[in-house]
């Protein structure tokens, strides 16, 4: 689901390249849209690709540093928390939410996840290191965090949040 027709249009060729066939993008008006309400408690997995400052992409988009401010990041964190809360309602017991951004800011990543876990004690943080190890990928830490200077990629963050069965 997304509120942006442009992002949904951009998603279609990316899905085709990925080989995924079980993804059905759909437009919604907001995180309380009736399409989402119908799925409450029924979904196995939700990926929250949260709108963010994009500061993890500075090496490709250096002008971003001039377009972001403390106020704009503060506005984004409110939106991120609301979207993550809405995603949590979709997941069945035993299901999973993955929260991801292309930001390096603690305010958009760790702080959002930590506040979410306080608001939603029915969820636990599953260490990314364990999930990645099952795929043969060595990684330390509770979160997946890609850093441009270490991994030669854009900056990226992901947290795995499992709903207790």
Describe each PLM feature range.
Residues 1-165:
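S-adenosylmethionine
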